[in-house]
Swiss-Prot record:
This is Large ribosomal subunit protein bL19. The gene is rplS. Gene3D superfamilies: 2.30.30.790. GO terms for cellular component: cytosolic large ribosomal subunit. GO terms for biological process: translation. It comes from Corynebacterium glutamicum (strain R).
């Protein structure tokens, strides 16, 4: 194990739940506004999870006031307070880019039993 691997291993988080594409998450993000810090909730469906180790990221999509919003987070970011899995989705793909074109009820994902 070289020096960079040791540094990466030291900054990995251990409180990340197991989730994959299709799951609905609550991501609690720290937002700094001037001198105050608050927590902002971003709730949506995971459309992709990519990378590995310290560089691993995931993208969450939600529809806010009729407009699709996607946000990409590093899994091991210190700006994420916690990640909660709300629902497990039953999908057959690792990347759910096709959800971008679907509207309304067609964009729903079945819940895993």
């Amino acid at each position: 194990m070289n020096i960079l691997d040791k540094i990466d291993a030291a900054s990995l988080r251990d409180d990340v739940p197991a989730f994959r594409a299709g799951d609905t998450l609550d991501v609690h993000v720290k937002v700094i506004e001037g001198t105050t810090t608050r927590t902002q909730l971003f709730k949506g469906v995971v459309i992709r999870r990519q990378g590995g180790g310290i560089r691993e990221t995931f993208t969450v999509r939600k529809v806010s006031f009729g407009i699709g919003v996607e946000r990409t987070f590093p899994v091991h970011s210190p700006n994420i307070e916690k990640i909660e899995v709300v629902r497990r989705g039953d999908v057959r793909r690792a990347k759910l880019y096709y959800l971008r074109e679907l509207r309304g009820k067609a964009a729903r994902i079945k819940e895993k039993r």
